[in-house]
Amino acid sequence: MSSAVMTTSATGGGHSLMESVDARTKLAGSNRMEILLFSLGTNETFGINVFKVREVSKTPTITRTPNMPAGVEGLISLRGNVIPVLELSQAMQLTDAPPGRGGSMMVTEYSKRTLGFLVHGVDRIIRVEWDKVRAPEAVTSGGHAYITAITELPNGKLVSIVDVEQILANTFGEGIVGQIEPMHAAEDFNVFFVDDSSVARKKIGEVLDKLGVKHKHAANGLEAWTRLSGMAGHAQQLGRSVKEEVNLILVDAEMPEMDGYVLTKNIKSDPRFDGIPVVMHSSLSSEANRAMGKSVGVDAYVAKFDADILAETLRPMLIKAGRD
């Protein structure tokens, strides 16, 4: 597995590292992503999607408070907002990480939550094709449960892309999906959803179960497109519409092998899926990411994770799709 990468130095620190993020929105639909590489003091190289990172700085003064979850170093004040700071190696339970506090902090925005992640050091930004990103079946890291994907640098070194959803769920708890009113004649509706995070798949499944609708899922964009194309081809052979098998498609934005933007473009450009709404459900909640979703034709964009908002977005769209 290899890929040509474009690199950007991260040694400038501060805002300069992230100042061109807005220009990167043109990556939407190109099946490419940009990864910020960093170290946790082990032999591994880790990465995080650039769109999740707001800034990088030296580790600031951190205020410790009682009863913090394991891995949470404390709180900082950042431009008037108090945010928690996690020591990422502890949150990922890396037993071979050196003791002591990481010297750099990545400020991230994830699922409408701003967090600081302490890391040993920040390297550079690379651009990589999503089809060169793989699920982490072969990862042997001590923190393998917190890795959502892997890719490879031109020198053969592997990059482990961290599963922020899993880290947050284990640190702060997954949250409870509350009461959701079931849909009338819910058994008539079918949802197909795709997300590479097991935490997200579990939560989405809970919401759909409470709505009472039937559902199927995939774990990455390529798997989703393969299965959806197969469903459409089978329906075509039987002289039926694929809408009899799926009434709505729910997609994550960033996924191994094919991202949600390319998946949406494929769906929207295939007449067999005419009339089937596509909802993008992503932890990348900025307006820029909403615009990226709109540019490829999504019918709605929902930021993770609010079970009520997700349910109330899907409900009228399913009813309308069922009538059409």
Predicted regions and their residues:
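An acidic, low-aromatic, low-complexity terminal/linker signal
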Residues: 1-247, 253-262, 269-277, 283-295, ...
